[in-house]
Amino acid sequence: MNTHAAKQQKHIDLFFQTHGPRYLNMPPVMEYVTEWRIREAMKRLDAPKSSKILVLCCAEAHEASVICDMGFTDVTVSDISTVALDLALKLDGRLSGRILDAGAIDLPDDSFDVVVLQDGLHHLQSPVGGMVEMLRVARRAIVFLEPHDSVSGRLLGRKWEVNDGEINYVFRWTKKLVQNVAYAYFAHDRFKNLSFSFCHHNIVYDRYFRFLGVAGLSALKATLDFFLGRLGNQFCGIIVKPIPVERDPGVV
């Protein structure tokens, strides 16, 4: 484990030892917008419910639990922190778990069908390297949620993220960047880039939620995403690998 990863582990351990799970008493608006992201991503991926899924940087594994709620039956969570991982497994008995560093995943190639990560790549020293590791470990697809490199993203978001003295640069993504990384990794273009951007701002949505409720906020969000999604502040990267073609042994 490198020095940066060790510092991240220490920070995550301390956070969950001090605060415990973040999502147990989540306000309804936060629950809606947080769960919408992972539900929409998995819906667009359209993977079989029997898929073997790995969730990296799981923290207390709220997103993994949502994936289980959607009907997926083989979900493994991982984190660099034993404190976070132990908490995740106690909160949801449907999950399996293991300690993994998302920046250097100690697994063979194609170990899982789908690899998922939410808000974790920008904590790595090499976010692009983290995406490449996901591509290596995933047999069929990767999904990650991170800030979007857009005007709204830069205006609404932060350049630097500071947590208990630990500083991270908030690395931002675009569909073109994801495409280029995948080109470089695969050395071909036989993959699908289903990445998309969307509008997501907790404070703004909380204000509207007080007047609109869940149904009204859902309609507002759908409208914003339809008209302004490409300019949105949040991003979902999705790469689907090509289905391997069985080579005819008689063909050289």
Q: Can you say where each PLM-predicted feature lies in the sequence?
A:
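Conserved class I S-adenosyl-L-methionine
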Residues: 1-46
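Class I SAM-dependent methyltransferase SAM/SAH-binding core
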Residues: 55, 60-104
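A conserved beta-strand element that flanks and buttresses the S-adenosyl-L-methionine
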Residues: 116
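A short, conserved alpha-helix within the catalytic core of class I
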Residues: 124-133
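Short, glycine-/aromatic-enriched active-site segment of Class I SAM-dependent methyltransferases
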Residues: 147-168
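Short alpha-helix
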Residues: 170-189
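A C-terminal cap/extension of S-adenosyl-L-methionine-dependent methyltransferases
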Residues: 192-252
